Amino acid sequence: QQRKKNMTLKIPRNQPPGKEATIVVAGTTHHHPEAWKWYDYFTFNVDHKVIGIQYLVTAFLFYLIGGLMAVAMRAELATPDADLLDPNLYNAFMTNHGTIMIFLWIVPSAIGGFGNFLVPLMVGARDMAFPKLNAIAFWLNPPAGLLILASFFFGGSQSGWTAYPPLSLVTAPIAQSLWILAIVLVGTSSILGSLNFVITILFMKVPSMKWDQVPLFCWAILATSVLALLSTPVLAAGLVLLLFDLNFGTSFFKPDAGGNVVIYQHLFWFYSHPAVYLMILPIFGIMSEVIPVHARKPIFGYKAIAYSSLAICVVGLFVWVHHMFTSGTPGWMRMFFTISTLIVAVPTGVKIFGWVATLWGGKIRFTSAMLFAIGLLMMFVMGGLSGVTMGTAPFDVHVHDTYYVVAHFHYVLFGGSVFGIYAGIYHWFPKITGRMMNETLGRIHFILTFIGTNLTFLPMHELGLQGMPRRVAMYDPQFTHLNEICTIGAYILGISVIPFTINALWSWIGGKQAGDNPWNALTLEWTTSSPIGKFYLW
């Protein structure tokens, strides 16, 4: 019970849905439902917990759409000829698969979903600094997704998720314009959300919480938000200029009219390589919370892991040109960005070392969350090793635009980011819903996902080394066998989503009741009731 001036707030803990919190103001009693109703999640709600769940559910729906596009592409690539999809439709699927997975699945779920739900709870704040701005940031995402889907009615954007001109200027201009507008909306959402996170973490944490007590997830979100604020406006500027070239007769990037396509690449990659860290830094934060809890051992090297997030934020702004080693980059620039690319691996290695040291000697519980965390360690190290090879200009020149790049990218972002999102869902599901997920279905989900990931993406390294170009619907028949293996793996990945979806829905509706702190975790969000109602106290 809390008393402040003439207000009395009575909040029953661990009560079943339907109970009410009683607020007495100036002698008048007001009754408020303790639990949110299902329809509250479809409204312009300013509660950070509701917004976090809105992000997670919406992002997962887009994940299913992007996954269907991926399975369709892999079905096409099972044979050398374009006998299933029209090549133009294949290009549209390829473009929008990448766009949806990056901008509407990983970024919204990792930052918007977990960040909004957890950050205020972890730092002891009542809500985000700007609740209405927070809601606006979320509601910019669904229209962006609808614009991307609507682009298929106009031929679909076919220039890849990078939208390089001049290709993006000559294929399906209406669809390309819709695609640009969608990314600008998502970018605006990212800027608003990042500003909110920075203010919340810096100025709204409880005064008694010292900086060396701030949860590592919050350090990761802080670094991610600063990086997004510095890089996202640059992408928005480049895309707006591209939109002008498409619709208003300008020639910023038209080579035949004096435009410079390399300038676009600089503008795009100044954001889009830091975007990789936007997608993986929050996952690093999730790992730093999940591993010590399920290893039942304090995190090893707290300060090193916290500061390494900030180091990645800084160094990550100076590595973008390694995507442009084949774009006529001068030798001195190749040398500088090769070195900076290798340097960024150092703070990442600090995190890996800290997690492995935490596991060493721990009393590990092989829960679904822990299995995905350990799987992420293996997948990300694999992706990191291939990334170090591509960071060196002499090697990158040979494998650029081959399937070697596709393999590396997916080991980092699927084996890294998606595994981490799954780990976070299994870990915080009891706090979000008040229910436990089924561990048997969770382990089946992990096994299928782990096998499918390696079967899909491991052979792509060999395909790239043999010279198979990426982003093609037809290929030389000599690559058929390895592509068949990749397609089988993609089918397994598609099937792996089924037990997870069943598990999440069934557990949310009728799963085993969870206690306030089923994992015996130590961060502040676990001191509230499960699920957290409209009002909560620590």
Model-derived segments and their meaning:
Residues 3-538:
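...captures the hydrophobic TM-helix bundle architecture rather than a specific catalytic motif
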